[in-house]
Swiss-Prot record:
Name by which UniProt lists this protein: Serine hydrolase-like protein DDB_G0286239
Biased composition (Polar residues): 334-351
GO molecular function annotation: hydrolase activity
Keywords: Hydrolase
Organism for this UniProt entry: Dictyostelium discoideum (Social amoeba)
Length: 359
């Protein structure tokens, strides 16, 4: 494994999972750390969403792997004959953890990623040590006629599959569209997300270079199966690990999926046994705006009730090895499973074209 010690940019890695797919990801922090964390991005976002907070956590000794969900970022799309289900993201998380040989781990998720973290923690409590939910908890729910929902999804399936991608003459045009749809996103944050979301192509009509979004267009289609709110609450009842939920002060105004959104979130929080809640200045993407407002809270949450202390960024490799040896002598090595080598990759080309790593 070729190591990139630049905590700010992270290390580009490719993770070959059991289904034969290479998942694109970014890594920060020491591989030998006892603190393992998977970072899950939101809908239509990508691993770059953690570029601001991950380096801070990594400098304190936390190993962080931020993945691109299938159909997002640099990860491949599912075949056209496959339908998309939110449960696929759950299996992706478990497949990645298995490929990394992590016996237990924590999860940090933003928006949809926080929802997936909730389900994984509820369904596999023996694997998840703690979860950090950024601006969301649980998953989207809807009181709908399931048969009609399936009918509508099937009726629109062909149209979405045959839809040609929109081509843009330059990157600025895509950025302008992003800002128009999400005016709260800061310029630097929006640009960071787009760096991993667009690719250069040749226009079939003009033969000139242009740009398109990488994400699977089916992601904007209707969902076939959506939980009812009562089912979401039953799921949240099953979460056994500590939960840190962080909200942005203005996100509720920007993220009004339902009129009674605040009441729904309050109801969900009442079903979580071990919950800590924090409100910080910022929008729905507050984790890309002002990390100093909450990074210390995450660190305290990650290290609380454990015989662990922060690892200074200046800690040498020898000191880390000595600390590792001492922990192993205590017999607390349940989470010291070393990751096998992950292949380095280049963000300028799709991960689907890269050779598979030896995991």
């Amino acid at each position: 494994m070729n190591t990139n010690n630049n905590f700010s940019n992270g290390e580009e890695v490719s993770i070959h999972i059991g289904t034969g797919i290479d998942i694109a990801a970014k890594a920060w922090g020491p591989k030998e750390s006892s603190q393992k964390m998977l970072a899950l991005h939101g809908w239509l976002d990508n691993a770059n969403t953690f570029d601001f907070i991950a380096p801070i956590l990594a400098e304190k000794g936390i190993r962080i792997i931020a993945i691109d969900f299938i159909g997002h970022g640099l990860s491949p799309h599912k075949p056209s004959w496959c339908n998309l289900y939110y449960t696929d993201y759950i299996t992706q998380v478990l497949d990645v953890a298995e490929a990394l040989q992590w016996k237990t781990f924590s999860i940090m998720g933003h928006s949809m990623g926080a929802g997936i973290a909730s389900i994984v923690a509820a369904s596999m409590p023996h694997l998840v040590e703690r979860i950090i939910c950024l601006d969301f908890i649980g998953i989207l729910s809807k009181e709908q006629d399931q048969i009609k929902a399936i009918q509508f999804a099937m009726q629109t399936r062909t149209t979405i599959n045959n839809r040609k991608p929109h081509l843009y003459n330059n990157k600025q045009a895509i950025f302008d569209k992003l800002k128009a749809n999400n005016p709260w996103i800061k310029d630097e944050a929006g640009q960071r997300l787009l760096d991993r979301s667009i690719e250069s192509v040749i226009s079939p009509t003009t033969g000139e270079q242009c740009y398109k979004l990488r994400h699977d267009p089916r992601l904007v289609g209707p969902s076939i199966f959506i939980m009812r709110e009562a089912e979401v609450l039953l799921m949240l009842d099953e979460i056994q690990c500590p939960v840190l939920l962080i909200w942005g002060t203005t996100s509720s105004q920007q993220f009004q999926i339902k009129k009674n959104w605040t009441q729904i979130m309050e109801g969900r929080m009442s079903h979580i046994k071990n919950l800590k809640q924090l409100v910080v200045p910022g929008s729905h993407h507050f984790h890309m705006e002002n990390t100093s407002a909450f990074s210390q809270d995450i660190l305290e949450f990650m290290f609380e009730e454990k015989d662990l202390s922060f690892t200074p960024s200046s800690t040498t490799q020898q000191q880390q090895q000595q600390q590792q040896s001492a922990e192993n002598k205590k017999g607390d090595n349940h989470n010291q499973i070393a990751e096998q080598d992950l292949s380095t990759s280049n963000t300028s080309s799709p991960i689907i074209s890269k050779p598979k790593p030896n995991l």
